[in-house]
Amino acid sequence: MSIASAADGYKLWYEAVGDGPALVFPARLRSEFAALGAALADRYRVVRYKPRQVVGVLEAEEEAGGPWDPAGFDRYPLEVEVADLHAVADAAGVGEFVIAGYSGMAALAAFLAPVSDRAVGLLVGGFPLLAGSDYWLGFEEGARASLIQAGLADKAVEHQLGRLLYREWGRRDDTAALAALSGPKVVWFGSRDCEPDCRMYDFVGGAAIARQIRSRAAQLGEAGFEVIEIDGQDHIGALATTEVVAPQLIAALMKAGW
């Protein structure tokens, strides 16, 4: 366990394993992406860190944290987010990197990739890249409104940055910027993601992740992405089956020269 200090003194937890070209994963939990990261660390330097927006939300933090109140923001603090990402990379001894993630953290990785001058590639799974942000904006705004109406304003704050992120993302067209990334570009997903038999169907079935990615495979290909479909896996399985997923991701990264 290691701690990086942001420019304003905020403490950020991170873990770095392996040597080689770097992959940086934002994570919601200290355990998130640990198994995948360990599998990838045979060839890469894998850095996982918790962005300040998730600190203390899903698990308690003793070492990380600091003064931070997202409730007062009326626009997404993109400069702070990128500076934090770079502070972690510096602490981990990383220069340029491929930014990576799965599901919600894939969204954050994809949002940051075009604006970080050190992110040269993107490796994301379980998220419909280039499919627009309307569904996810509605998800965040609906969750926030429900909590406010239930008298849980303190919990509603947890969705404040999410709604600001998707509002800003909806005003951007990142297609050209993503195509211009010089490093690896990979999207992977389970063939059953958000289908009726998916274990996440009752929560985000409307996202139709597998169908959305398939329908944009040609567009992703034109932007330089390799699209990997993990046969028979749902949203959970396309991350949890490390022995199936990791070799395919390594092959795609190596094919792209990483």
Regions found by a protein language model. Name each.
Residues 79-97:
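Conserved acidic catalytic loop of the alpha/beta-hydrolase fold
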Residues 181, 187-189:
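Short beta-strand/loop motif that positions the catalytic acidic residue
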Residues 161-177, 210-215:
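Active-site nucleophile elbow and catalytic-triad environment of alpha/beta-hydrolase enzymes
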Residues 95-130:
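Conserved hydrolase catalytic core segment
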Residues 195-232:
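Conserved loop-alpha-helix segment in the C-terminal half of the alpha/beta-hydrolase fold
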Residues 20-28:
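Short beta-strand element of the alpha/beta-hydrolase
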Residues 38-66:
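Conserved alpha/beta-hydrolase
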Residues 221-258:
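Catalytic active-site module of serine/aspartate enzymes centered on a nucleophile-bearing elbow/loop
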